[in-house]
């Protein structure tokens, strides 16, 4: 080892440099030889010239170097100025605008249906004169329904096809029947126009109670919620159990529209009380009255027990079931105290019957039942 | 001189044993491909082959034609870098 060290350290720089050069040239020669072997093998195996194109093709695909043309020989805006005739509307359209035009013309693109729906929604808006900027309002969700739009509902299907084929020729006449893609409603069903604006519920059509007669109102009110929204003055078209309005509201509306005597609420809630009264089973009723003595007696209830015929008019803050039970308890208390109490229970029961009964029933068969009891 | 040759032999041996030679080779090959040296030389090969005729080309023909040209065509940057590395190695291991 010592000998090697001594020999190595004895080298001077020139020799080192020469050595470095030698090593370098060895490396380069290795690289060249490697290439030669590769090429030779490719030649002998026959794949050396495979990646070349033949001369003929070379001439065909040569790079074009003329002015006004790109390297493939194509003119840049060759089709820009050409015009095509639309097969649908037979107008001549610029080539670059042809595709979007066709989309709208045929009514088949994404945008075209959106625009059509929006147009219809805004035309309905103008027709119904509703206040339209209420997106974040609760009442927006009322399926308000316009009487006028019901007429247009019948034309909906034919309009759809007609509308699409003639779309671009429709003048901006909002009242034209062709443009009325309608807003036909059953309870809770959405119209087409809603789909165009997913964030705006269909608020622009609703029942205007002023236009309806009393019979119509009554029939409406028996099936629908009917609560009049403050903002649009229209009636809610949802079912009787619509979650947006309370029973109190519904009752108030009926009182308002139909008059005090005719208010009726065919609710499922009150089945317990009204049905058993209708069955005229006084005993059962009495037992029910005595059963529930624990519910609160609202002040309006005691007032109603005095005013037997008109207690349905009073607006009770509590929910219906509770107030009716409260009434029961007063009746029960009355019943328990004997004949004097019996008469008061009679009146309270009369009040009960008035509130729950349908308007056509005669007021009290109650005295006859309690004659038996007494 | 024999000392020199002995010394050279030693160094070469060290170069190989430590794997530095292989590394340098790979480095050179990569750099030459990168800078287009390979393609240039290949084109030259094509000419030679077309000249000599496809069937009768031998390895010797190619080597004789290609190697001198190859040596010349190596770009300066590649050469410098390689020499630098070799000198570094020598400096580290020769003294």
Curated annotation (Swiss-Prot), chain B:
GO terms for molecular function: transcription coactivator activity. One of its GO terms (biological process) is protein transport. It is found in: Nucleus, Nucleoplasm. Keywords: Activator, Chromatin regulator, mRNA transport, Nucleus, Protein transport, Transcription, Transcription regulation, Translocation, Transport. Gene3D superfamilies: 1.10.246.140. Component of the nuclear pore complex (NPC)-associated TREX-2 complex (transcription and export complex 2). Component of the SAGA transcription coactivator-HAT complex. Within the SAGA complex, participates in a subcomplex of SAGA called the DUB module (deubiquitination module). This is Transcription and mRNA export factor ENY2-2. It comes from Salmo salar.
